[in-house]
């Protein structure tokens, strides 16, 4: 499928094994796999309706490896929004996001208009937690981005993550419906301007 100029591109970054692919697959296909299969790069698409025209939500699931810096730079330069994933069971995985965030700042420049979500995945493994949510919230405030904890395994906050990311988009109106119900915030937004929902 050729890339369209009106694609809305979301890039997902994070260390290997934090659950990037699991989050994307849970959102796009509603599935979860127990086994870990390293990703080089996969792209998933969802059709969304945006201001009465059709566009595509394109989600790029990037590699957790540091062996492909050129691919990482390309994903950042083409991306409209970013999801930075760490595992709550691994402090190291949170540390590894810092250079990625710095690279996004360097490539994108004006961070005010860039939607970014900091995501603590695997919140179902709380007994093994190494990163407290308060610590991640503080980092998100420093980065001026949103924060959420998720569990791809339990399907906790997965759709909500993508909804919140799209709510952060200031340059155009994009949103998705969760179980056919629209939030009060979404209804308010739609009254103010055009609307975008996942089909």
Swiss-Prot record:
Positions of short motif Effector region: 36-44
Domain of life: Eukaryota
Disulfide bond residue pairs: none
Subcellular location: Cell membrane
Pfam families: Ras
Catalysed reactions, as listed in the record: GTP + H2O = GDP + phosphate + H(+)
Pro-peptide positions on chain: 197-199
GO-annotated cellular components: plasma membrane
Lipidated positions per record (S-geranylgeranyl cysteine): 196
Positions of modified residues (Phosphoserine): 35, 126
Listed EC numbers: 3.6.5.-
Residue positions binding GTP: 14-21, 33-39, 61-65, 121-124, 152-153
Any one GO BP annotation for this protein: signal transduction
Keywords assigned by UniProt, alphabetized: Cell membrane, GTP-binding, Hydrolase, Lipoprotein, Membrane, Methylation, Nucleotide-binding, Phosphoprotein, Prenylation, Ubl conjugation
Signal peptide limits: none
Membrane topology classification: Lipid-anchor
Physiological role: Displays low GTPase activity and exists predominantly in the GTP-bound form.
NCBIfam families xrefs: small_GTP (TIGR00231)
Protein name: GTP-binding protein Di-Ras2
